């Protein structure tokens, strides 16, 4: 009889929450690397709340945008805090999502195909949102970043120029561009929220992967209380780091050029995106051809989709494949070095290093399955 059951098991809405956060059967051996999903949810909520307060004072107009952000920081109660939390919150969002994806590659969680595909879509949406958010303060780097990145579409044969003008809403970046970027920057986080729910829905169809990469149905425990407390440790650490950065060095990850109002007549010496796009920007710059660069840029993220198709191993997870582990960490270092190269000027040693690193980055996805097949032959034959 339902009368004796707790409300979380009988109420139509609470039942869904209960199945996702309280009574969810969870592998008992998942490590701290499995915390990052919930940390990403926390980051998203922080971004939506701080963004909502910022949008109350922000003005999407090229004459007023820069000064409205200035006004928020100087005159609004705790406006400086809300703005820097929002800007640095985005950085933490990307740190968490990159670790989350890295964990997915390391333990080969991409075999949960639907979850993985939705995750890649979320990554694209997040990148689009962050890019458009960077344009909103309408500083020098906002303006020129928007100019450079939207101009990449002109590399598309035949349709390119028309497409760029369509996105700009005119023949140059103007008020129409800022207004539409603001519109999409506002709506996309809610689409990300919806996609996150779909991501979770697919995950809960199959259950989580675990550090051993084997079926854990024999040894599952309820999510609450053990993993709720374990997640809370992650929340506290990330919240502390975010608040520490925001209160000690809030503009550390920003660009000094963005303290100057946008001026179409003066080009900054070195145009670069925020740090979390630098690896992709370095890949873009490594290809001498414009269209080739754009394709490489998109493929640097889209290549994640092919991972489930390159799985030919007998055991899941590279924790049992020493050579693949070395290869994985080389790839991680490659991405860090690409991030460094993206922030360097387009000069001789940097260009060549960027090209070498780009080849190394893409070759990981080719060499990794080959090495694992070779290792399987060594072990099983």
Curated annotation (Swiss-Prot):
Principal localisation: mitochondrion
Q: Where does a ubiquinone bind?
A: 204
Q: What is this protein called?
A: Cytochrome b
Described by its record, this protein's role is as follows: Component of the ubiquinol-cytochrome c reductase complex (complex III or cytochrome b-c1 complex) that is part of the mitochondrial respiratory chain. The b-c1 complex mediates electron transfer from ubiquinol to cytochrome c. Contributes to the generation of a proton gradient across the mitochondrial membrane that is then used for ATP synthesis.
Family, per entry: Belongs to the cytochrome b family.
Question: TM spans, by residue?
Answer: 36-56, 80-101, 116-136, 181-201, 229-249, 291-311, 323-343, 350-370
Cofactor, how bound (note): Binds 2 heme b groups non-covalently.
Q: Tell where it localizes.
A: Mitochondrion inner membrane
């Amino acid at each position: 009889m339902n009368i004796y059951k707790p409300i979380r098991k009988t109420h139509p809405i609470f039942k869904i929450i209960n199945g996702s956060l309280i009574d969810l059967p969870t592998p008992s051996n998942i490590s701290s690397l499995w915390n990052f999903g919930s940390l990403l949810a926390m980051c998203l909520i922080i971004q939506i709340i701080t963004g909502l307060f910022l949008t109350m004072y922000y003005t999407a107009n090229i004459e007023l945008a820069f000064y409205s952000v200035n006004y928020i920081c100087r005159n609004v109660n705790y406006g400086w805090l809300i703005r820097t939390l929002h800007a640095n919150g985005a950085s933490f969002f990307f740190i968490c999502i990159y670790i989350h994806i890295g964990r997915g590659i390391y333990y080969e969680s991409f075999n949960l195909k639907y979850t993985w595909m939705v995750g890649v879509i979320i990554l694209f949406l997040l990148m689009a949102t962050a890019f458009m958010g960077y344009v909103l303060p309408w500083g020098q780097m906002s303006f020129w970043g928007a100019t450079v990145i939207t101009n990449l579409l002109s590399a598309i044969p035949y349709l390119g120029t028309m497409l760029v003008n369509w996105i700009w809403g005119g023949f140059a970046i103007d008020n129409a561009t800022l207004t539409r970027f603001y519109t999409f920057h506002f709506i996309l986080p809610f689409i990300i929220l919806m996609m996150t729910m779909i991501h979770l829905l697919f995950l809960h169809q199959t259950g989580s992967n675990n550090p051993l990469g084997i079926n854990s149905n024999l040894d599952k425990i309820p999510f609450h209380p053990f993993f709720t407390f374990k997640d809370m440790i992650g929340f506290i650490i990330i919240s502390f780091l975010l608040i520490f950065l925001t209160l000690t060095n809030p503009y550390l990850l920003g660009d000094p050029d963005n303290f100057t109002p946008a001026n179409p007549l003066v080009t900054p010496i070195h145009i670069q995106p925020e740090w979390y796009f630098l690896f992709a920007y370095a890949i873009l710059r490594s290809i001498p051809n414009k269209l080739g660069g754009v394709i490489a840029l998109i493929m640097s993220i889209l290549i994640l989709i092919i991972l489930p198709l390159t799985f030919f191993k007998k055991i899941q997870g590279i924790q049992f494949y020493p050579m693949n582990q070395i290869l994985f960490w080389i790839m991680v270092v490659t991405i860090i070095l690409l991030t460094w190269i993206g922030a360097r000027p387009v000069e001789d040693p940097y260009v060549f290093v960027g090209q070498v690193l780009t080849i190394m980055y893409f070759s990981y996805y080719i060499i990794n399955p080959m090495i694992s097949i070779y290792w399987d032959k060594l072990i099983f034959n």
